[in-house]
């Protein structure tokens, strides 16, 4: 059947090496990309003493987000 490699005393054909390589690479990618995904922690609620303070904090955060987008 053509050329073959002798690895650890066994005859291994080139197509078997190719299939083994493809399976190993795809299997590694699947294993690496699977698993538990870490959830992003939610932002804590605003702890304001009064409604005016809460409005000030909310307005400040909106301004900062707008400045970051620019």
UniProtKB/Swiss-Prot annotation:
Keywords: ATP synthesis, CF(0), Hydrogen ion transport, Ion transport, Membrane, Mitochondrion, Mitochondrion inner membrane, Transmembrane, Transmembrane helix, Transport
Keyword Ion transport: yes
Pfam families in the record: ATP19
Keyword Acetylation: no
Function of the molecule: Mitochondrial membrane ATP synthase (F(1)F(0) ATP synthase or Complex V) produces ATP from ADP in the presence of a proton gradient across the membrane which is generated by electron transport complexes of the respiratory chain. F-type ATP synthases consist of two structural domains, F(1) - containing the extramembraneous catalytic core, and F(0) - containing the membrane proton channel, linked together by a central stalk and a peripheral stalk.
Subunit structure: F-type ATP synthases have 2 components, the catalytic core F(1) and the membrane-embedded component F(0), linked together by a central stalk and a peripheral stalk. The central stalk, also called rotor shaft, is often seen as part of F(1). The peripheral stalk is seen as part of F(0). F(0) contains the membrane channel next to the rotor. F-type ATP synthases form dimers but each monomer functions independently in ATP generation.
GO cellular component: mitochondrial inner membrane; proton-transporting ATP synthase complex
Membrane-related topology note: Single-pass membrane protein
Gene: ATP19
Membrane-spanning intervals of the chain: 15-32
Designated name of the protein: ATP synthase subunit K, mitochondrial
